[in-house]
Amino acid sequence: MSRLYGPVERKPRNEYGTLHLVRFLGTDYGRRRIGLALSDPSGLLSRPWKTLASHGNRHAVAKMIGAEIAQLLAEDDGLAGIVLGYPRKLGGEPTDQTAAVTALADTLRLSVSVPIVLQDERLSSREAESLLARRIKNWRDRKPLLDAASAAVILQDYLDGRAPMSDRIAGPEDLES
């Protein structure tokens, strides 16, 4: 379940009549580290991108994430939206981190021009750990990758739930001029 901060506009075609590709940034915000993930330009798949050190208050963190967003907006693929992991307990109650994420979303919303979505992140770290453990046996080698992998899980959950597959995949009629 996601909570939307502003509309996510999706333009199916650009001015040349070809499919308009969209990219999203996924974020797993923690007290020590911030995991970042990116979707592919088609908006179908996520991948871990990088991990940032989280130090300072939410304004400092928002500034740091804002710099990453500015860099992504300047690239050819652009950025259609930001997906922030929204922490909840298994029963749905807020955690001690929920208010911090909501405050970060509010701060980011004031400083960036792209929509922000809060996406349920329950069990995302466990799923990311499980996925990494299949490829990397040593915990010390997995640990630095965990936050970005968790962000990729959160982002993939959002991408999977945002539109039916038929709305996201080009058919033969989309390939004709």
PLM regions: where:
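Phosphate- and other anionic-substrate recognition elements at nucleic-acid/protein interfaces
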Residues: 2-27, 31-177
